[in-house]
Every structure is written in structure tokens, then in C-alpha cells.
Curated annotation (Swiss-Prot):
Protein's UniProt name: Dihydroxy-acid dehydratase
Pfam hit, one: ILV_EDD_C
Subunit structure: Homodimer.
Gene Ontology terms: biological process: isoleucine biosynthetic process; L-valine biosynthetic process
The EC number(s) this enzyme carries: 4.2.1.9
Residues that, per the record, bind Mg(2+): D80, D122, K123, E446
Protein family membership: Belongs to the IlvD/Edd family.
Cofactor detail note: Binds 1 [2Fe-2S] cluster per subunit. This cluster acts as a Lewis acid cofactor.
Catalytic activity: (2R)-2,3-dihydroxy-3-methylbutanoate = 3-methyl-2-oxobutanoate + H2O; (2R,3R)-2,3-dihydroxy-3-methylpentanoate = (S)-3-methyl-2-oxopentanoate + H2O
Length: 569
């Protein structure tokens, strides 16, 4: 056991003395048991994490009962919703790296034998996933659970995105201040990750497909008593994984990442999932090509449309059978999933989900009667995005699947939001927001403010938005993000001028800037990236280390196994 280095032998008497002082060691027999790290992420200001201080207790009890010794520690958690649309959002994606590094530091410093990760919200899940494959000790994930959808006064289900879009509706005179207040008060009824197929719930679902979480992890509500049984199972199962020496890199293989993307596109997950899965692959030493997402999306049908793409929420998916039902339906068509991949259940994916069926085809369609024959995410390439851009096609209306329009260019999210809410954008425009990439922002801010404003102002079905920033999982509409190379690196997006024609075709996977090459070359020669003044602290270091979005915006040098050790095509 790893932990023997801190508890075995005469030389470790001081270590044992300190361990006794914690109160965790109950008797001498505890020194013979595996030490299990429990990486919690409790934070009172984050509704998806505010309950985790109580949540963890049953997990620790189950570890004890199974023959392990649990040691809980905490890492940071940032609420993307509260950080949205102000400078705090610059810290959102960088916080992913801090989560990964803090978990690595605690586990390596104390030589734990196994790890239980308790994340829930947007950057905490991928941060812990990155740490898990980096550390490569037996690990299991159990999330805090999704939030129940709210209810408007007319009974319709609502969520946080309803409030963001309500701001635009209020500015457009469609609702009054009282209506907006009612949305605000009803949209988020309690603990849990926000109720739609946004980034947090997308990532918690993908943990099941990757094989690192038990069935039910992604969809059982935070307030559902069944989550108690899931926690106890996780506490028992980690001890079994330690006995079997089943490690994350035995589970998170290139084929397992394919499975995660298949689930992702079948459920119309957040575009952020592409960023995060690429980062997890990098940490596992896998060079996973961005273009492969299109291959998977082209062969994988869309079986669900969840908020923001419909009025359905994660609780509806759970009622219909959860992630296991989606994977079970996909497994009925050969070639969509790699069913031999291992999971933390101790079984293969096929053994875990092969007999599970949808309990409600209105929520989870069968593979032979899908909502769409192709998946809900797409990677675009072209003269505006030579290294790629991403879009959630599942949330795009049919008339915006192809579009050509004049660019209206902004050098920050704040400028764009003000223009949209000020009525300066018209039908047919292509809003361009640049210098918001990983390096240029810095921090790769989410553009939920402007995208929600477009919907609220009645422009969501006639205006496109293109950015080197990224989007909330709650974004809907023709919103194309992660444009690479980003403006701060001199990518073509930096050269766009107001009125330039931009064309895209989401089915063909193209994104083009319709400006002659000679003109672009002249603009490139004259281009000087703007200097961001006053950048200090962590973000100043982040700018120097962050890699492009096309490989997950990880920090260089890459951690884990050396990059290129395992190429995947």
C-alpha cells in the first residue's frame, strides 16, 4: 500500500504520532488498513456544494465499514453562475487547474491508497478528473447531485437560464420587474448543480460513461434519498477497487473517452465538455484529436433534448432511467460504444448498462427512433477557425444551421452585452466577441450574458455569435465558441472588421471569413495584440502557461505521462 511509507516501521513513529493526533485513527488495527482520501469541495456560496459538508458523512461511514480509513480534505469550488458577467469569471477555468493541483498535492503529500472525489459544479468535476488520471491510484467519483427544476407561477419548469434570459426579456419590455423577480425567486429551489444539461450535469453524466462513477451519479437529484445509497455504495466500492488495484488509467482509455463523447453528443451536452475531456485525455497521456469528435457525432444519434434545448430537465432523464438508459439504448446499435471498457462497478460498461432501457421514450428515445440521426455537438474548421471551433447543434434552430451575415465586432464580453441590451444588434448579424480566449481574456470567460441577452431580446433565432471565448452549458442558439487560434495569438478572428461577411454551415462543419487573402495578409502584417494592463497574481502566471483550447486549455508543460506517448486517431 502507498500509505505504508507514512505508517510502517520504526522510522515512521513520528508520522504515526501525528496521525493519532487527528482522532481518525481509532486503534492499532487502523494502521493495517488502506488510507482513503476523500476530496470534498464544500463551499457555502455555491448551491451545488453548500450541502457537501453533511453529504460526505455517509461516505466516510461506508469506507469505515468496508475496512478503510477515511481522511477528508477540501478543495476550492467556484460557482460559475455567481462569477458570470464580471471580472470574476476570468478565474473560472483557471480554477480547474487549481482543483487538480490541490488534489494532487494532498494525495501525493500524504501517500493515500485510494481516492473518493466529491465534486458537483462546472470546473470542480473536470479538475478532479484531471487529478485522478494524473495520480492514478484507485479512484471513484460521487457527485453532490443535480438541483430540482424550479416552477414558474404558471407551472412551467424553469432554471437559472430562465433568469438570465429574463433580463433580456425585461430590457425588451416583454416582462416587467415583478415577473423578473418571480423568476429570480423560483428558478433555483435548493441544493444541487443547476437543473439543465449544462456543464456541471454534463460532466457528472460523463463520469458514468468514462467509467469512474457508479450508475446514477449524473442524474439522481441532490435531495433524492437514493443518493444516500449511491454514496454508501461508493464508500464500499473504493475499498474493493484498492484490493483489485483497479486504477483510473485502466479505465480512462482512448476508447472510454470515445464512450464519453458518444454519451455527450447523444444527450446534447455542453460545449465545455469538449474542452474538459480533451484536458483529461492530455493528463492521461492521450493525444485525442479534436476532429475525432465529429466522427463520433456523425455516427451517434441524438436521444435526448434537455434544457436549454427543451423544457425537460435532469430529473426527467433520471425518471426515464438515467445515464444507464441512454447508454443502454446506444449499446443496441453496434459500433456506437466500446462495451468492453472497464468501470468502477468492477464490470465492463456492457455488463453495467446492456440490459437497461428507457422508461420514457418522450425523454430518452430509442436508438432506432432518435430525435436526430447525428449527435448534438460539432467541431467546425475553416478560414476563421483553422484549428477548430465548437457549437452545440442540439440547441440551434433549423433556420440557423446555415447562415451568412455581417460581422459586428467587440473586443470584450462587456462591450457586446451592452450593445445587445442597448438594441444595437439587428436580425441577420453575426456578433463577434474576441480577446476572450484562454490567453486573451485571460481565463476563457463564458459568454452566457450576451447569449442569454440575444434570446431575451428576441434575436436568438436570427443572430449568430462567434467568439474565441466559451459558453455556459446553458447557452442556446447559433453560438460558436473556442475559435482557434484565439485573437491574442493572432488568429484570424483578430483580423475581422465590422461588416466583414462571415459564413458557416453546421452540417458541413465549416466556418469561413469571406475576406480576400491579400486583404487578410495586409491586416495580419499591421496587427499588434493589445496589451492587458495591471495583470497580477495567479492570472499573470496562467497567461504564460495556458495551452490552446484545441488541446483542452491545459497548462504547459503537460502533467501526467509525457504528451505524445499515446496518439489516438
Amino acid at each position: 500500500m502507498n500509505s505504508e511509507v507514512i505508517k510502517k516501521g520504526v522510522e515512521r513513529a513520528p508520522h504515526r504520532s501525528l496521525l493519532r493526533a487527528t482522532g481518525i485513527i481509532k486503534d492499532e488495527a487502523d494502521f493495517q488498513k488502506p488510507f482513503v482520501a476523500i476530496a470534498n469541495s464544500f463551499a457555502e456560496i455555491v448551491p451545488g456544494h453548500a450541502h457537501l459538508n453533511e453529504f460526505v458523512k455517509e461516505i466516510k461511514e461506508a469506507v469505515r465499514e468496508a475496512g478503510g480509513v477515511p481522511f477528508e480534505f477540501n478543495t476550492l469550488a467556484l460557482c460559475d453562475g455567481i462569477a458570470m458577467n464580471h471580472p470574476g469569471m476570468r478565474y473560472s477555468l483557471p480554477s480547474r487547474e487549481l482543483v487538480a493541483d490541490s488534489v494532487e498535492t494532498m494525495v501525493q503529500g500524504h501517500r493515500f491508497d485510494g481516492l473518493i472525489c466529491i465534486p458537483n459544479c462546472d470546473k470542480i468535476v473536470p479538475g478532479m478528473l484531471m487529478a485522478a488520471v494524473r495520480l492514478n491510484i484507485p479512484t471513484i467519483f460521487v457527485s453532490g447531485g443535480p438541483m430540482k427544476a424550479g416552477r414558474a407561477k404558471d407551472g412551467r419548469p424553469i432554471d437559472l437560464i430562465s433568469v438570465f434570459e429574463g433580463i433580456g426579456a425585461f430590457r425588451a419590455g416583454k416582462i416587467d420587474a415583478g415577473d423578473l423577480l418571480e423568476l429570480e425567486q423560483a428558478a433555483c429551489p435548493g441544493y444541487g448543480s443547476c437543473a439543465g444539461m449544462f456543464t456541471a450535469n454534463s460532466m457528472n453524466c460523463l463520469c458514468e460513461a468514462l467509467g469512474l462513477a457508479l450508475p446514477g451519479n449524473g442524474t439522481i437529484l441532490a435531495v433524492d434519498p437514493r443518493r444516500s445509497e449511491l454514496k454508501k455504495w461508493a464508500g464500499r466500492q473504493i475499498v474493493e477497487l484498492i484490493k483489485r488495484d483497479l486504477r483510473p488509467r485502466d479505465i480512462v482509455t482512448p476508447e472510454a473517452i470515445d464512450n464519453a463523447f458518444a454519451l455527450d453528443v447523444a444527450m446534447g451536452g455542453s460545449t465545455n465538455t469538449i474542452l474538459h475531456l480533451l484536458a483529461v485525455a492530455q493528463e492521461a497521456g492521450i493525444n485525442y484529436p479534436l476532429k475525432r469528435v465529429n466522427l463520433i457525432s456523425a455516427r451517434t444519434p441524438t436521444l435526448c433534448k434537455i434544457s436549454p434545448a427543451s423544457s425537460l430537465h435532469i430529473e426527467d432523464v433520471d425518471r426515464a432511467g438515467g445515464v444507464s438508459a441512454v447508454l443502454g439504448e446506444l449499446s443496441r446499435k453496434p459500433g456506437l460504444l466500446n462495451l468492453d471498457c472497464l468501470t468502477v462497478t468492477g464490470e465492463t460498461l456492457g455488463e453495467t448498462v446492456g440490459q437497461v432501457q428507457s422508461l420514457d421514450p418522450r425523454v430518452i428515445r430509442g436508438v432506432e427512433e432518435p430525435l436526430s440521426p447525428v449527435g448534438g455537438l460539432k467541431v467546425l474548421f475553416g478560414s476563421l477557425a483553422p484549428e477548430g471551433a465548437v457549437v452545440k447543434t442540439a440547441a440551434v434552430v433549423p433556420q440557423m444551421m446555415r447562415h451568412q451575415g455581417p460581422a459586428v465586432v467587440f473586443n470584450s464580453e462587456a462591450e457586446a452585452s451592452a450593445a445587445i441590451l442597448g438594441g444595437r444588434i439587428k436580425h441577420g448579424d453575426v456578433v463577434v466577441i474576441r480577446f476572450e480566449g484562454p490567453k486573451g481574456g485571460p481565463g476563457f470567460m463564458e459568454m452566457l450574458g450576451p447569449t442569454a441577452a440575444l434570446v431575451g431580446m428576441g434575436l436568438g433565432e436570427s443572430v449568430a455569435l462567434v467568439t474565441d471565448g466559451r459558453f455556459s452549458g446553458g447557452t442556446r442558439g447559433a453560438c460558436i465558441g473556442h475559435v482557434c487560434p484565439e485573437a491574442a495569438s493572432g488568429g484570424p478572428i483578430a483580423l475581422i472588421k465590422d461588416g466583414d461577411l462571415i459564413s458557416y454551415d453546421l452540417e458541413a462543419g465549416t466556418l469561413e471569413l469571406l475576406v480576400p487573402q491579400e486583404e487578410l495578409a495586409a491586416r495580419k502584417a499591421a496587427f499588434t495584440p493589445p496589451l492587458r494592463q495591471g495583470l497580477t497574481g495567479w492570472l499573470a502566471r496562467y497567461v504564460q502557461m495556458v495551452a490552446p483550447a484545441s488541446i483542452g486549455a491545459v497548462l504547459r508543460p503537460a502533467c501526467g505521462r509525457p504528451p505524445g506517448e499515446q496518439d489516438y486517431e
